Amino acid sequence: MIAAVEVDGRTCIIRSRSETDNCPDDSSEWDAWGDGETVPGEQHRAVIVVDGDIIGTMSWHAVHYGPTVGSRAWSMGIALAPQWRGQGWGSLAQRLLGDHLLASAHRVEASTDVDNVTEQRSLEKAGFHREGVLRAAQMRADGRHHDLVMYARTRD
């Protein structure tokens, strides 16, 4: 288990994803990736469970800003099933995973499409700070590179 918390009598758990998990369709208009190649490297995956129901997924991978271990950060992402959006579970899950990842790195970051204002608010509620726009940073299924907004939390 990565994290667990009780909120208003409901239990939220973040745990590693297993191959037998029956995950909901948590895709959205922001997930139109196309048939592109997956980035090589280690990708960690987790599920968000509320009162026993899997409501979404999370992932994270290492980002290196220099050759030393101390220069490593984590980049994380989230997807929630539509019926669970707008209830605060995404912000809570991102805060919990961010707390967990900050135990092993000084920096945790997350980015989202410049037009995804809902996720930007969610990240801010989770304690992330807006750092700026990454121009043409992410290729999507429409064949265009999209701008992303970068958010981060640090230990200090």
Predicted regions and their residues:
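Acyl-donor (CoA/ACP) binding surface of acyl/acetyltransferases
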Residues: 1-21, 45-156
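Active-site rim helix/loop that mediates acceptor-substrate recognition in acyltransferases
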Residues: 26-51
